[in-house]
């Protein structure tokens, strides 16, 4: 059957090609100019539709799905400021290498800069934050243009998910009629009667995607592998550092490399390597407490590592980053995108290659001679740190104690999304390694507190695992409208709300002693979040102590629906506990 008009033809062709390329869901926001795309997606039988009233929340929701799946969920919005609301999520996706596909509807070109309603300059709206941009021509039932459209869809998916994944922006212009209104074939908006309906006039007998893209795995050459192997074999004090990476080094490849070298593993909670069966299987320690001891004076007495193999982005932990900065050794950074994720500028070698292929190649013939005393040093430091955390949690409760309990009590499997600011830092320091299938996610590309709830719910929509969101009060407030997705997108979550009434992280900075600190940095708000229970049809409960939290959390992760568990803290008190733990661990290590 011939499409009723050229806009419908164009949109259905684009959507059909995206589906052929593997797309199975979309995030739609209401608007008129995007009607052709909205109808085409909504009526496609193989598309799951997530409807969002707010484009900013929609973009972070799509970001969360992509973090969990590694594949883009297209976003569709109308013209004007709607597209600008995608920008914060685009920045995060760009800087953390997460695939996004943005389909922004636009007006015909003659209306740009004319004063026409809801018309802004959308060309290259996101600047250099996208991997590829295309200003699409106006729809036309012409075979060459439709072949271009199909090829563009294939390229958009390939650019978004390639070796350097990230956002792609297609700016889609439409004239009226925007609805699937039948138009005469001799009308500019009409479709010729002889247009081949099934093939849309340009499929030329192909099955599946119009263009099938294949990407090879970048493996380091033999000379490079041998050079790195020589360094690893000569090392007595080697380390493997796994930084944040949604789709990074696999646990299997890590096991092979760690077993071959004997190097301790320092695993960021966002590396996907701090948790899993390998934690107990490996003979070398998988370390998660380094943030609590690497900055201590006692560690200054340790010998430097003589080689470090690094995967993923720059670590969350500042003490670890500074430890690597001050280490006088070779540091091999494996980065498949060649993105130079190296904020301390200490890497001596950049390997632009696939992490698994690199680790497997290095493990193939490497036989490490790492000193047993080097491993024991980290084992002892880890034990000291976790003993101190356990002892402190039994006597007092602080924000980090909540993260420790969440990590220990989360079901296996589970998806955990951790907010920026203090929650991710406390997760890094107090989330102990565990033999459990925990997928821990966070927005550490630009590290903003915007869109946290929406990103978490997007991740939850892509898995059947229980979802746990740990967020602070400012992040909860900042993205409160994201809670609407709980009902509209059928996502359940356990939300752990750490409420210290403002910006607790600023207690870690020298500005704490300045007269402007309270009003301009800590910014206490005094908000009561309990009314979100009625507004968003969730369950809200405030707990008073550790026993209540552990009981309520254990119940929530086994219960349908969404429960918000609020725990209130004094930010200054929590900061004091962190300092006390640092001193306790340092004193114990110094006395060993």
Curated annotation (Swiss-Prot):
Give the enzyme class. transferase
**Domain of life per record:** Archaea
GO biological process terms held by the UniProt record: menaquinone biosynthetic process; organic acid metabolic process; sulfur compound biosynthetic process
Keywords assigned? Magnesium, Manganese, Menaquinone biosynthesis, Metal-binding, Thiamine pyrophosphate, Transferase
Task: Give me the comment on cofactor binding.
Answer: Binds 1 thiamine pyrophosphate per subunit.
* Keyword field contains Aminoacyl-tRNA synthetase: no
Pathway(s) per entry = Quinol/quinone metabolism; 1,4-dihydroxy-2-naphthoate biosynthesis; 1,4-dihydroxy-2-naphthoate from chorismate: step 2/7; Quinol/quinone metabolism; menaquinone biosynthesis
Reaction it catalyzes: isochorismate + 2-oxoglutarate + H(+) = 5-enolpyruvoyl-6-hydroxy-2-succinyl-cyclohex-3-ene-1-carboxylate + CO2
Keyword Cell wall biogenesis/degradation assigned = no
Q: Which Gene3D superfamilies match?
A: 3.40.50.970, TPP-binding domain
Pfam families reported in the protein's UniProt record: TPP_enzyme_C, TPP_enzyme_M_2, TPP_enzyme_N
Q: Which PANTHER family match?
A: 2-SUCCINYL-5-ENOLPYRUVYL-6-HYDROXY-3-CYCLOHEXENE-1-CARBOXYLATE SYNTHASE, PROTEIN PHYLLO, CHLOROPLASTIC
Q: How does this chain assemble?
A: Homodimer.
The name of this protein is 2-succinyl-5-enolpyruvyl-6-hydroxy-3-cyclohexene-1-carboxylate synthase
- Please name the source species: Haloarcula marismortui (strain ATCC 43049 / DSM 3752 / JCM 8966 / VKM B-1809)
Protein's gene? menD
